[in-house]
């Protein structure tokens, strides 16, 4: 699989990153993984909201740099990450998991159980983030002034962690159903939760990626592009002009850099019903429906902003209860 090949041939070798795209494309070709088979269509960018054009214009020179193969390389700060070939898994809860809502604690405990010794899980907090990354003076200053929220600071953190170390970033409110995720994560160079479906100019993502569940090797150009695009944005603006800034940055990289798009496209559609239980969590569990859901989906996105119950008002087991019973 890709994870083993990467560890044996590439690792943290800076020289390898200069030829990363060619190496990954060769690996995909050798494994006979077709780009065309997967969901790689482009949206008609002429119909996208103005935010896309703003980010595209802002990153015009950056896109040209990446088109020439001049990718960002950020060396690791903590060289113990991923030791013994284990994949880094990044989870962030700024105040620490002990201070997190109960649902978050349950989700993270489930991740730790399911990954076991197969991954190097790192939980990032305000107390330890400097051990792994370094925010620029611009970002630090604008965060301290209140221009950058904790949510958008975590976006910048995510980009840096993935660029420096690679591995998987997973939102703390994802619940892993079973161990199918191990094969899925290691089978492809880039992996993300990808619902697929029809392209929609009103939805910049259109099921092509999920920025809260992304895995790839250290130095993967998408991650470097994200780091540099955030710096460009916050160097110019003092407020987030659109909540989905992160996705617009990914979209520009996806649309403007065909080789990155092909590698992202090699990740198959997966976990199509990932969002369902956030809506159905308090409904009475239909075992047949649950079986159909989990035949397709092993990753469920929940929310701590909603109160989930173990039983309905008439005493029936809920979908949320069914999830927790898997523990």
Residue spans for each PLM region:
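Small-residue hinge/turn detector
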Residues: 155-165
């Amino acid at each position: 699989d890709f994870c083993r090949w990467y560890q044996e041939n590439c690792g943290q070798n800076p020289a390898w990153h200069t030829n990363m795209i060619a190496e990954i494309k060769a690996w995909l070709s050798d494994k006979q993984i077709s780009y065309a088979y997967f969901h790689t269509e482009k949206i008609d960018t002429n119909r996208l909201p103005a935010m896309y054009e703003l980010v595209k214009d802002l990153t015009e020179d950056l896109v040209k740099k990446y088109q020439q193969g001049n990718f960002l390389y950020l060396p690791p700060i903590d060289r113990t990450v991923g030791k013994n070939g284990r994949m880094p898994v990044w989870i962030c809860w700024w105040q620490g998991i002990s201070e997190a809502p109960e649902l978050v604690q349950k989700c993270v405990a489930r991740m730790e159980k399911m990954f076991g010794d197969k991954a190097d899980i790192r939980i990032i907090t305000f107390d330890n983030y400097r051990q792994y990354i370094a925010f620029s003076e611009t970002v630090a200053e604008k965060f301290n002034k209140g221009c950058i929220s904790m949510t958008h600071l975590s976006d910048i953190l995510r980009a840096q962690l993935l660029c420096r170390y690679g591995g998987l970033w997973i939102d703390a409110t994802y619940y892993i159903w079973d161990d199918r995720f191990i094969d899925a994560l290691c089978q492809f160079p880039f992996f993300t939760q990808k619902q697929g479906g029809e392209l929609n100019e009103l939805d910049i993502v259109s099921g092509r990626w999920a920025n809260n569940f992304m895995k790839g090797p250290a130095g993967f150009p998408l991650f470097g592009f994200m780091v540099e695009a955030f710096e460009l944005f916050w160097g110019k603006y003092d407020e987030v002009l659109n909540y989905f800034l992160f996705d617009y940055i990914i979209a520009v990289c996806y649309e403007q850099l065909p080789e990155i798009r092909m590698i992202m496209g090699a990740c198959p559609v997966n976990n199509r019903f990932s969002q369902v239980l956030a809506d159905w969590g308090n409904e009475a569990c239909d075992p047949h429906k649950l079986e159909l859901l989990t035949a397709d989906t092993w990753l469920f996105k929940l929310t701590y902003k909603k109160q989930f119950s173990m039983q309905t008002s008439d005493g029936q087991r809920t979908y949320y209860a069914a999830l927790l019973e898997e523990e």
